[in-house]
Amino acid sequence: MTTHRKPSQEQGFLNGQFLLAMPGMSDERFARSVVYICAHSDEGAMGFIINQLQPVQFPDLLRQIGVIGEEDLIILPDRAQHMVVRNGGPVDRTRGFVLHSDDYMVDSTMPVSDDVCLTATVDILRAIYGGGGPERALMALGYSGWAPGQLEMEVAENGWLTCDAPLDMLFDSDIEGKYSRLMLHMGIDMSRLVSDAGHA
């Protein structure tokens, strides 16, 4: 049995937390984005935008990569039928990743926090198609990456807000409203934040 060690959250690192783009974010790709940080160290950071959608549907993606055939589309479990594909970020946009609850583990699974893991192999897609796999999961194509010190600088320059990442907020299906709900969760008045951002 493979033992997976949970990552430690060292001082100043944001593993397992959300980034919320501040109004006026200069990079349009991240405007009003919510990013879940999976890895953050002196060597840089990586995470996934979780509130942007890809145009491809999960069943079609399974068919495109050969996990299922055309004839299998009608027998997919309801969960797989309705699963959406997120735009995880601008890096490696054809590569798939699954963030999921810690009730699914294979050798390639990477623990992200106490209850969230990351798997980037086709095995987990087959498990979800078969009606198994983790209880909670989200699929993303591409990821967001930062060079050493880059994320720290962007946070210090008020490019991002940071907050804890409740599981319900990470995995729920209200993608369009996620940014606003997290702002409310943090007690932030968006109208005031936008107004303040417009002043030097």
From Swiss-Prot:
Single GO cellular component term: cytosol
Matches recorded under Gene3D superfamilies: VC0467-like (3.40.1740.10)
Disulfide bonds: none
UniProt-listed SUPFAM superfamilies: VC0467-like (SSF143456)
Sequence intervals crossing the membrane: none
Homology family: Belongs to the UPF0301 (AlgH) family.
UniProt name for this protein: UPF0301 protein BCAN_A0487
Annotated source species: Brucella canis (strain ATCC 23365 / NCTC 10854 / RM-666)
